[in-house]
C-alpha cells in the first residue's frame, strides 16, 4: 500500500525488484 513513486501504465514496475507491484497504474509496496 505504500507508493513507490513509479507508474506502470506503459512499462512494468522497475521497482518490482524492491518488492513493488502494479496496482491501478501505479507501483505500490504493501
From Swiss-Prot:
Its main location: secreted. There is a cross-link at residues 1-30 (Cyclopeptide (Gly-Asn)). Transmembrane segments: none annotated. It holds the Pfam family Cyclotide. Disulfide bonds join 4-20, 8-22, 13-27. InterPro entries: Cyclotide, Cyclotide_bracelet_CS, Cyclotide_sf. This is a cyclic peptide. It comes from the Eukaryota. GO terms for cellular component: extracellular region. The presence of a 'disulfide through disulfide knot' structurally defines this protein as a knottin. Belongs to the cyclotide family. Bracelet subfamily. This is Cyclotide cter-O.
